[in-house]
Amino acid sequence: MPRTPHLLAIQSHVVFGHAGNAAAVFPMQRIGINVWPLNTVQFSNHTQYGRWTGQVLPPEQIPALVDGIAGIGELGNCDAVLSGYLGSAAQGRAILDVVARIKQANPRALYLCDPVMGHPEKGCIVAPEVSDFLLEEAAAVADYLCPNQLELDSFCDRQPNSLADCVEMARSLLARGPRAILVKHLNYPGKAGDTFEMLLVAADQAWHLQRPLLAFPRQPVGVGDLASGLFLSRLLVGDDLRNAFEFTGAAVHEVLLETQACGSYELELVRAQDRIAHPRLKFEARSLAM
């Protein structure tokens, strides 16, 4: 019987709704991953409601919790680390120490960094020190980096004028160390207004994926967290880059279709769970010239 992969997911959590680990853990489990959730913040709900309660995990608790896992002899069984929303740069540095420790215990372990830098207009606030940490430190350690367009622009200190520019910008990040860059949401001049586009760039390959853009009165939160978790999970169960990319695009769209059909603001993960594991749809990733 094949071994079930184990993944340490270090990101935010909400008690109500779906963002951070609350958006990613259950879908990753439905893919067949044993997920170890470690919550960098625990809030009552996501911040786009405009009000919330909760607290940030003290940075020293991150290595302390990992010490506990090591103490029972399980650290070497960790196959991957996923990091997302950070409450502070100190948390980020603690995570990089954990990644180094896990890679020492299991040299084949992967690290995917979802570099959440915030979007004040949408109510997502991230301290400037966190953005600096992601730009200057985390990108050099990550095996996979999964920015959205705003985060890609920040990494490259420029904005694209075309899809070709987006490819060039993502490719420039490979020089910092990652194996591949997944741009979870593209936005550039000339992009079709009725499509949602994603980009995956590796050393000698690039793929572009388009799917229909679904309309919502208020855009659901947690879609990027869901995408990052699904992409890493599919790599862990044996997909190559292109198949993991296509699966991610399809499964996320299935969740959004269910969410739209229900008229929900929060992602309908439970109702869509079978379609997450086995998407009915497929969106072909088009190979791009490098």
Swiss-Prot record:
Family indicated by similarity: Belongs to the pyridoxine kinase family. PdxY subfamily.
Xref: InterPro entries: PM/HMP-P_kinase-1, PyrdxlKinase, Pyridoxal_kinase_PdxY, Ribokinase-like
Keywords: ATP-binding, Kinase, Magnesium, Nucleotide-binding, Transferase
Cofactor(s) required, per the database record: Mg(2+)
Protein name in the entry: Pyridoxal kinase PdxY
Reactions catalysed according to its record: pyridoxal + ATP = pyridoxal 5'-phosphate + ADP + H(+)
Top EC class of this enzyme: transferase
Pathway: Cofactor metabolism; pyridoxal 5'-phosphate salvage; pyridoxal 5'-phosphate from pyridoxal: step 1/1
One Gene Ontology term of the molecular function aspect: pyridoxal kinase activity
Entry annotated with the keyword Kinase: yes
Organism: Pseudomonas aeruginosa (strain LESB58)
Subunit structure: Homodimer.
Cellular component terms per the entry's GO annotation: cytosol
Binding site for substrate: 12, 47-48, 225
Binding site for ATP: 114, 151, 184, 211-214
EC numbers for this chain: 2.7.1.35
